[in-house]
Amino acid sequence: MPRKLKLSFLNLTVTCGMWVFKKYFISPDYSVCGDVHNYRNYHRLGRAREVAIWLTTECNAMTIPNISYANERDLIYITDGLKNISIVAFSTKGKINDKIDYDLLTKAVKKVVDDLPKLKAIIVYDVTVNNKQSNLIFSYAKSKGINVIIPNNMLKNRNIICSQQNTNEYA
């Protein structure tokens, strides 16, 4: 009997054993919080890694680790278990306009690039109208020869359209 697992972060039901996935998944982001004990964030990271392992072993899917952290103390363990990884994912959503979050994201990028010797690419979930700030944040990775990929997504496209409409209103 095939196993079923409801993957709410993807809004779909995956039945393993019947299909071979040729897709890439980014591991879920079980939001880490800055105002809780560190063990809770470590547990959330572990849950995300468990789902990634399940997708990889049971569904034959390639799962890209999502790097998440709440504060500087989380940077200690964000690369645990990832030494042989060549691709990771970051989100800049909500971190561009806040100086503290922006600086923390920049430190996280540096930590990941320095800690993962086999890293070749970073996929960035970004919702800004242009990639100017993201390019600055990931400039350290680019300087080390890491390919930084910032694909379009629905929210980014919506923000681009809204910014063009706002520009046209004032033209």
Task: Put a short name on every predicted segment.
Residues 139, 163-171:
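C-terminal structured domains
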Residues 2-158:
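Eukaryote-skewed repeat-based solenoidal scaffolds used as protein-protein interaction platforms
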